[in-house]
Amino acid sequence: MAFLKKSLFLVLFLGVVSLSFCEEEKREEHEEEKRDEEDAESLGKRYGGLSPLRISKRVPPGFTPFRSPARSISGLTPIRLSKRVPPGFTPFRSPARRISEADPGFTPSFVVIKGLSPLRGKRRPPGFSPFRVD
């Protein structure tokens, strides 16, 4: 009988101890969830909500992405970011032609025959335009 009492008290004691551990773990989880919710709320208040549309850079009034930044912000002198080019420069003339005009002894390494398409090697009729539809 004494053995049965001791074992019953032991089981009861271990049950109470394990129950207190479970309650403590539940309390810690609850506190952690509460902390996470408070952090999320504080972030939401700080950034005006968690929507990606609301979290964006501040832009000056009148700013449009289609104009250069120097023109969109008033009060700044215009900044030329492009490099200076020689007078008469056009990007539609080949550099070989420019060099040959400057140096009469220059010969280009390749010559495109007039009327020959460099893409397919086919002759095009005079006045041909790929943009004109007959």
UniProtKB/Swiss-Prot annotation:
Expressed by the skin glands. Expression levels in inguinal glands are much higher than in granular glands. InterPro entries: Frog_antimicrobial_propeptide. Residues 24-71 are annotated as: Disordered. Coiled coil: none annotated. Transmembrane segments: none annotated. It comes from the Eukaryota. One of its GO terms (molecular function) is toxin activity. The modification 4-hydroxyproline is found at residue 126. Pfam families: FSAP_sig_propep. Residues 23-44, 71-82, 99-121 form a propeptide. Residues 1-22 form the signal peptide. GO terms for cellular component: extracellular region. Keywords: Amphibian defense peptide, Bradykinin receptor impairing toxin, Cleavage on pair of basic residues, G-protein coupled receptor impairing toxin, Hydroxylation, Secreted, Signal, Toxin. GO terms for biological process: defense response. It is found in: Secreted. Residues 24-33 have a biased composition (Basic and acidic residues). Belongs to the frog skin active peptide (FSAP) family. Bradykinin-related peptide subfamily. This is Bradykinin-related peptides. The lineage of its organism: Eukaryota, Metazoa, Chordata, Craniata, Vertebrata. The gene is BBN.
